[in-house]
Amino acid sequence: MPWSGIPGLIALGAVMTGAVAPPALAFDFYAGKTVDLIVGNSPGGGFDIYARAVAQHLGHHIPGNPGIVVKNMPGAGGARAGHYISAVAPKDGLTIGAVMPGTIMGPLLDEKPDTSFDPANVDYLGTANTGTYICVTLDRSKTKTFEQALSQKTIMGGIAPGNSTNDIANLIKTMTGAQLELITGYKGTLDVALAVERGELDGVCGWNWSSAKSQKPDWMASHKLNFLAQIGLEPNAELTSLGAPEIWRFIRSDESRKVAEVVVSQQAFERPYFTAQGVPSERVAMLRAAFDATMRDAQFLADAGRLGIDVSPLPGTQLQEMIQKLYATPKAVLEQAKRAIRP
């Protein structure tokens, strides 16, 4: 089946291979030039902060050492930035982009997808992180395990349809029968966390683990969370050590698992970077090699540590293959996935 190889691609991507060296003439291209990094989100958010950390180091690994300038272009759930990079900007390798995984999944799962950007027709440089969602309650909640959530009402907070806090909660409810009640409309995960602290909610599902650690370090330090489940294509060692079971334990049928994998797969490319198709292949190779080198750069990793952001990359060639497989998913499976996240 087209989607069955995605978990294996992640495991394979954990060992990054060296890129093929581009022709010698390509090394002269970037000298004295500036590369625009278009971010499909507003300034100041977690996605923007991450992109700026990458930008500080990426140019050092591109032959010719071009400058990297971050430009924010929010709108249409990231599709505005994607459209600009893929259809408007010159296809010369001087424009790259960073959009949310939801932007890539939108054409597959949105009820009314934005058709101005086709994520299957760009060249991916890689993803800086492969993340994991968590489904958690605060320690005072009566629901302390997933087994308890199967039999008693548990109130979870969400932001909006299309956001993981809504979609993952609905997916879990649909696929496992968990008695989750979703209250939606919060402005962000910090607002959800505040509502949990006020006692309005039991917890949240679909919270990115990396974001949770940076947004609520006090909860982590004081062990205030009950980890009902971790949601990802591969287990997260840190979460496993904290006792968080994989959601797949509670999704029994093969059919349900295949549907759930489509939705969960976006965690495999949490911080994707790309350029337009049509950029000369040798420049794409250079950008991919530079991205891989940045992910291994000791100074970048130190900066990431100070910022509290996780780095768990996959190279561009494997991200490309993963997204091609996703876009080959049978329509019937996609329709089931849509119904699961928006019941």
Q: Where do the PLM segments sit?
A:
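Bacterial N-terminal signal peptides
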Residues: 5-19
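Sec/Tat signal peptide C-region and signal peptidase I cleavage site
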Residues: 20-26
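Hinge/capping helix and adjacent helix->loop/strand transition within the periplasmic-binding protein
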Residues: 29, 35, 60-62, 84-95, ...
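An extracytoplasmic/periplasmic, membrane-proximal ligand-sensing/linker region
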Residues: 32-35, 221-228, 250-252, 258, ...
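Extracytoplasmic "Venus flytrap"
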Residues: 37-51, 75-77, 157-164
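Short beta-strand and adjacent tight-turn residues that come in two discontinuous sequence segments
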Residues: 98-99, 159, 185, 205-207, ...
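A ligand-binding cleft/hinge motif common to bilobed small-molecule-binding domains
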Residues: 101-113, 166, 170-175, 198, ...
